[in-house]
Amino acid sequence: RSAGVSAVYHFYSEQRRKTFKRWLMDPSYEIKNERLKILLYELKYAGHKVGLHPTYDAWNDSELLKEQKKTLEESLGSKVTYCRQHWLRFSWKDTWLNQARSGLTQDSTLMFNDRSGFRNSCATSWKPWNPKGHKEHQIGCISSVIMDSHLFDYNNFSCCERNEYMRNWIIECKKVHGTCSLLWHPHTLTKDYGWDEDYNMMLEAISDKEL
């Protein structure tokens, strides 16, 4: 927030009994933990948005999405409308339809896993077409253009190269007054990863009004 940038923080809110697969694929924190509730309030009152980070198996299940959304809302104390599917798990046929059925209204799942870019071919938010209902889906979508792993795991950039790479994508979006999402996982800001310097460079580029 000190950089003049607000964000959407997505939280996992699973309440089912853990199976081995869920231990392996999903986060392990408890959204009803009092310390996490305090963090949710702090984010909300600092002007940020809180969204749902559904479980690995929720991408095609509206009831599961609705249940997880409700659990997060109970901890947050207000309505949740944003989401991004875990592991970017997504189906053109089912995911948007089930998100809308669950009461979610904004999704930022659509992106490439291993490279940066506009997967919907343009820097804009939109309501995708529902071929089953012959009308638009009742959910808005924003393409996620950059993910932290694109910069470190899928490319062998130097620090300067990463900075230039990020800035070029941000400039491209700003030039057309577009809309896009940038995905950064909070655990990579720890000393174990040390990606915090690049995260701060990204915030500076976003807030730089001269770009």
What spans do the regions from the language model cover?
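Acidic-and-aromatic substrate-binding clefts and catalytic sites of carbohydrate-active enzymes
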Residues: 15-20, 25-34, 55-65, 84-93, ...
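Short, well-structured secondary-structure segments
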Residues: 1-56, 179-183, 190-191
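Short hydrophobic/aromatic-rich motifs at helix boundaries and adjacent loops
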Residues: 40-43, 66-69, 142, 176
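A cross-domain feature marking catalytic cores of carbohydrate-active enzymes
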Residues: 9-13, 52-56, 84-87, 108-110, ...
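Alpha-helical structural signal in soluble globular domains
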Residues: 42, 46, 71-75, 98-104, ...
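Active-site-adjacent pocket scaffolds in enzyme catalytic domains
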Residues: 1, 17-19, 71-173
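C-terminal domain-boundary segment and adjacent tail
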Residues: 2, 45, 163-211
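A general structural detector for well-ordered alpha-helical segments in enzyme core domains, enriched
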Residues: 35-39, 64-72, 95, 165, ...
